[in-house]
Amino acid sequence: MKLYGGFGSPFTRRVGVTLQLYKLEHEHIVLRGSVPEELERLQKFNPLGRVPALETDDGRALADSATILDYLDQLAGPEKSLTPASGDARTEVMNIIGISAGAVEKSISCYLSLIHI
């Protein structure tokens, strides 16, 4: 597998941490959508040009950290998965993840507006 994105992105970082926790062999390739020279290559894996993106061993491209984490949970199997497989426990975990991801996105947006990007 290949993980595309810089660890300056909290979303790339959460995928990288999960890959390490699951002990899944992967290559990390630093690509940033904010760098014009890297954007075109990144768009091959995520048409939106956002990180992270994951290229699976069979060549599929996955975009968005939530989608990638769901894929990694499936690879890890039910015994190792960080997310419950079903039921109320899964719903509660997914809700917490959604709120957390939204808070991070809002923080990044506020930061970027302060530095006028």
PLM feature spans:
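GST-like domain detector, emphasizing the conserved glutathione-binding G-site
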Residues: M1-I115
